[in-house]
Structure formats: C-alpha cells, structure tokens
Swiss-Prot record:
It comes from Hydrogenovibrio crunogenus (strain DSM 25203 / XCL-2). It catalyses: [ThiS sulfur-carrier protein]-C-terminal-Gly-aminoethanethioate + 2-iminoacetate + 1-deoxy-D-xylulose 5-phosphate = [ThiS sulfur-carrier protein]-C-terminal Gly-Gly + 2-[(2R,5Z)-2-carboxy-4-methylthiazol-5(2H)-ylidene]ethyl phosphate + 2 H2O + H(+). The keyword Transferase applies. GO terms for molecular function: thiazole synthase activity. This is Thiazole synthase. The gene is thiG. SUPFAM superfamilies: ThiG-like. Keywords: Cytoplasm, Schiff base, Thiamine biosynthesis, Transferase.
C-alpha cells in the first residue's frame, strides 16, 4: 500500500483523549484479585495499560501491605482512576469520591453505585443522583452503568463526557451479552467516549467491542484470574490493538452468498463456469 503524505501524517488509531489526557493504550485495567503484588505489576506492565483503577478502601487500609500496594501502583507511572466500589447509595458514593480526590489528587472518579448484590447491577436512580452532584463538584465522572439507552441519555444530560456500560455482570466473563443495546448507545452518541466496563472475559470480547466502535475497554478479572496474568495481559494488549485497527480500517460487508476471491482470468477453460 502506498501511503500518501496525508496518510503518513495521520496519528496512530491507538491515540485517544480521555478525561483531558492523551493516551496511547485503549485498555484500562483494575488492580484487584491478582495472586500477588508482583503478578499485578507484571500483568499491568505487559498489558500496556496507562490507566489503573484503584479502590479507596484498599489505599486507606493504612497497614504495611497497603503502603506496599500503593508504592507499586505509583511505580507503574500510570494514571490512577479511583473507584467507589462497594457503595450502595448516592450519599455513600459521593463521600467516597470526595475522599478519593484528596487521597489520589485527581478529579477522576469511576462511579459505581451497586443496586443489586446478586448480579452487581448499578442502581440507575442513585447513580444518576450521584453523577449530578459530582459533576457539579468538578469531577470527571466515569460512570459504571448498564446498557440502557435512556439511562445513558440521562447521564449525558447530567454532564458526563464518558459512559461505561457493562458488557455483562462484573466478574462473569460472559462478554457482550447485548450487542444490540451497546451498538444503540454507540450510534446515539457518536462523539462521546464510550468504554465497555465489566463482563469482559476473553481477548475476543475486547476485539468485538472495539470493532463496534467503542473507544476503550476496562477489565480486571479476565487478567487477574487467569492462570498466567502476565501472559494474559499481553494477550489483551494485542487484542485491543487488533480491535482498534480493525475499526479504523473498516471491515468488509457481510454477504448472504459466497463470492470468489480468486479471479478466473487465466484459469483453464474446463474449470471455468
């Protein structure tokens, strides 16, 4: 392929801006559930992720293990995305977010307000309430939400520049259970930053979401619970790159019937039809 100057100057498809930061990895990764701190560090480095999610509860433990964990996170030179994991009300999430801003010195917050302990589904009412307050308080809210289009609209109206709909319940590894809904959100908000959060279990799930036009992937369990987290981190790095480049290139149109890929010119006449 001959690259014109226009093509040559085009920035890498991997480059994107989220929360005011320009990054070169579309993968956001969690810091929990790893078999050891060393496995966590190795897996995150292998994944190439530039954003790491952390829990205020983990950092606030105050013991030596908590300090070791935090020092290791800082050594990764990644942007920290604090979360409100474990919160079940807007009030609780708002308080946690405000504390996280002081501890981690960032206005980013991954907003989680869980409404059901059975499948860890977000509470849409409390999530929206917390979002409105935190946006007004100067936070860049990364809301963990469902794939409901109306809720997505309300969150955008509340001031969200980013949406993070789930692929499937947290930790389930079931991938994208409702591609139709996810695609509807993408089509409804073509310019918004969209990140699939939760349910990613395999690298192929990440590829599917990115081929759909989603901007990023947030995962934790898929890497942390792999028998080999470091190798799985590498696998997701490659998968995310494949998905982004595939979307940028554009995939072929599906056909109902076969279409020969080999031309018949020069084929012996007795093989031509």
């Amino acid at each position: 392929m001959n690259l014109t100057p226009e093509h040559a100057q085009k920035s890498s498809p991997m480059s994107w801006t989220v929360g005011g930061k320009t990054l070169n990895s579309r993968l956001l990764i969690g810091s929990a559930l790893y078999p050891s701190p060393q496995a966590m560090q190795g897996a995150i480095e292998a994944s190439g992720a530039e954003i790491v999610t952390v829990s205020l509860r983990r950092q606030s433990a105050g013991d030596q293990a908590g300090k070791t964990f935090w020092n290791m996170i800082k050594s990764l030179n990644c942007h920290v995305l604090p979360n409100t994991a474990g919160c079940h009300s807007a009030k609780e999430a708002i308080t946690t977010a405000q504390m996280a801003r002081e501890v981690f010195e960032t206005n980013w917050i991954k907003l989680e307000v869980i409404g059901d302990q059975y499948n860890l589904q977000p509470d849409p009412f409390e999530l929206l309430k917390a979002t409105e307050t935190l946006v007004n308080d100067g936070f860049e809210v990364f809301p963990y939400t469902t794939d409901d289009l109306v809720l997505a609209q309300r969150l955008v109206e509340a001031g969200c520049n980013i949406l993070m709909p789930w692929g499937s319940p947290i930790g389930s590894g079931k991938g994208l259970m409702n591609p139709y809904n996810l695609n509807a959100i993408r089509q409804r908000f073509p310019e918004l930053t969209l990140i699939v959060d939760a349910g990613i279990g395999k690298p192929s799930h990440a590829v599917q979401a990115l081929e759909m036009g989603y901007n990023g992937i947030l995962l934790n369990s898929a890497v942390a619970l792999s028998p080999n987290p470091i190798t799985m981190g590498k696998a997701f790095k490659s998968a995310v790159e494949a998905g982004v480049y595939a979307f940028d290139a554009g995939t072929m149109q599906e056909r109902d019937l076969a279409s020969p890929s080999t031309p018949v010119v020069g084929t012996p006449f007795w093989h031509q039809h």
